[in-house]
């Protein structure tokens, strides 16, 4: 778990997200409180539950990105789900319990990767020896012991050096590897994912541990053997135990579009896709135990971050019990021209930096001037104001249109420097922005 202080967390988020200081502050405190909780004794630790967060703001202002970056900083199991994908229990559709199952799957994958990385050097040594055993067969017994040892060691050293330098990558060898398990695709109705997963695991285990002899290039054999040897060094039970603990103590669930499951004020009668889903979500957020194929998972200390635009509803339209379980409410502000300008240049791997890097692979140098950046920001803001406001995502649409000709004719401009200035932006965008009907389809 991250031991970063709230100011450090906000500083790290600032590298990727512009503005929204209030939201960053709220998630930074929530993350730090997790670390604080882990420092307490067991009795008190169990009593302290996370303060879940509700982010309110239009699309494209950074709600999802804040949650995603937070999970990376915390090195925690993280999953993003759309509230609209779920239906009330008893109806056709995904049940909310699958959120925790998917989160546990993500944790298993995360812990497995961590374990493989930890054993990386050991695996490389084992694989190297297995390849050398094939390349340098053991000599016959009619050699004297001294001659055998000296000659074998010299030969091994020569082949080891060649192997490490990649000289033998294209050479083909025959190796014994575990037979691949039979691929069984099982179709199941929505909500039956758990049963499907168990049946697939059952069929995969039927193959046992049979070995096949395969003829492969050394570079391909190395990859295959690394997977095989890494799997041998991994303790599956330990991974399950560690993953379940990671989910229960550090898991983060981001529920997007929660406003879409609010019951409309003017509607009456049961609504499968709205209030019923909220009531099914409630036990997860309050704390319950969910059965997964890896074991039982308690949700008491999982952090839930919900978000929605709430354009046709308000947070008070959520059922009261769910409102109470999302005590921290943060409003994210619409993006201004200055925000767009900063988004284009300031974040790590900003959009303009990405385009520069892509064009550099073709030998084309792109230079965005300060005036050009300002014009792009103004164009994005104007289009958002006159049409649908999609926030920072509008910049991708605008830049893609700006770079269209450059990308298409990149091969003809090798070695050239192209300047994206005020004149260039005006030439390519002014007509589209002024003609609202045309812009609606293109931008």
Swiss-Prot record:
Q: Which cysteines are joined by disulfide bonds?
A: none
User: What SMART domains does its record include?
Assistant: AAA, ClpB_D2-small
- Gene giving rise to this polypeptide: hslU
Residues that bind ATP: 18, 60-65, 256, 321, 393
Main role? ATPase subunit of a proteasome-like degradation complex; this subunit has chaperone activity. The binding of ATP and its subsequent hydrolysis by HslU are essential for unfolding of protein substrates subsequently hydrolyzed by HslV. HslU recognizes the N-terminal part of its protein substrates and unfolds these before they are guided to HslV for hydrolysis.
Keywords assigned: ATP-binding, Chaperone, Cytoplasm, Nucleotide-binding
Example of a GO cellular component annotation carried by this entry: HslUV protease complex
Its domain of life reads Bacteria
BP GO annotations:
protein unfolding; proteolysis involved in protein catabolic process
This protein is called what? Answer: ATP-dependent protease ATPase subunit HslU
GO-annotated molecular function: ATP binding; ATP hydrolysis activity; peptidase activity; proteasome-activating activity
**Family as reported in the entry's similarity comment:** Belongs to the ClpX chaperone family. HslU subfamily.
Species whose genome carries this gene: Buchnera aphidicola subsp. Schizaphis graminum (strain Sg)
Q: Where in the cell is it found?
A: Cytoplasm
């Amino acid at each position: 778990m991250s031991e970063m202080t709230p100011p450090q967390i906000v500083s790290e988020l600032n590298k990727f997200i512009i503005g929204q200081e209030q939201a960053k502050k709220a998630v930074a405190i929530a993350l730090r409180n997790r670390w604080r909780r882990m420092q307490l004794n067991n009795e008190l630790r169990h009593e302290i539950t996370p303060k879940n967060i509700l982010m309110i703001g239009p699309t494209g202002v950074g709600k999802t990105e804040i949650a995603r970056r937070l999970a990376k900083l915390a090195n925690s199991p993280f999953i993003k789900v759309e509230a609209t994908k779920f239906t009330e229990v008893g109806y056709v559709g995904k049940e909310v319990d699958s959120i925790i199952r998917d989160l546990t799957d993500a944790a298993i994958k995360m812990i497995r990767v961590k374990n493989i990385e930890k054993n990386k050097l050991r695996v490389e040594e084992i694989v190297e020896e297995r390849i050398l055993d094939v390349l340098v067969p053991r000599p016959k017994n009619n050699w004297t012991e001294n001659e055998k040892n000296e000659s074998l060691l010299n030969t091994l050293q020569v082949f080891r050096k060649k192997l490490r330098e990649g000289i033998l990558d294209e050479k083909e060898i025959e190796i014994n590897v575990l037979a691949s398990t039979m691929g069984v695709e099982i179709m199941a109705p929505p909500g039956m994912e758990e049963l499907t997963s168990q049946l697939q695991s059952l069929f995969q285990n039927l193959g046992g541990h049979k070995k096949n002899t395969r003829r492969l290039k050394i570079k391909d054999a190395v990859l295959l053997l690394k997977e095989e040897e890494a799997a041998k060094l991994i303790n599956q039970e330990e991974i399950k135990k560690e993953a379940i603990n990671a989910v229960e103590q550090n898991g983060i669930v981001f529920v997007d579009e929660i406003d879409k499951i609010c019951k409309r004020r003017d509607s009456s009668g049961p609504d499968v896709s709205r209030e019923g889903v909220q009531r099914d979500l409630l036990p997860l957020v309050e704390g319950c135990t969910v059965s997964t194929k890896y074991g039982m998972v308690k949700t008491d200390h999982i952090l839930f971050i919900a978000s929605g635009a709430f354009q046709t509803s308000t947070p008070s339209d959520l059922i009261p019990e769910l409102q109470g379980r999302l005590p921290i409410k943060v409003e994210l502000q619409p993006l201004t021209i200055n925000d767009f300008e900063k988004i284009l240049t300031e974040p790590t791997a900003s959009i303009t930096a990405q385009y520069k890097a892509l064009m550099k692979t073709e030998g084309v140098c792109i230079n965005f001037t300060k005036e050009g950046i300002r014009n792009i920001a103004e164009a994005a803001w104007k289009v958002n104001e006159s049409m649908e406001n999609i926030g920072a995502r509008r910049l991708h649409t605008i830049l893609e249109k700006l770079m269209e000709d450059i990308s298409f004719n990149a091969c003809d401009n090798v070695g050239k420097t192209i300047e994206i200035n005020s004149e260039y932006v005006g030439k390519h965008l002014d007509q589209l922005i002024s003609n609202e009907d045309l812009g609606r389809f293109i931008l």
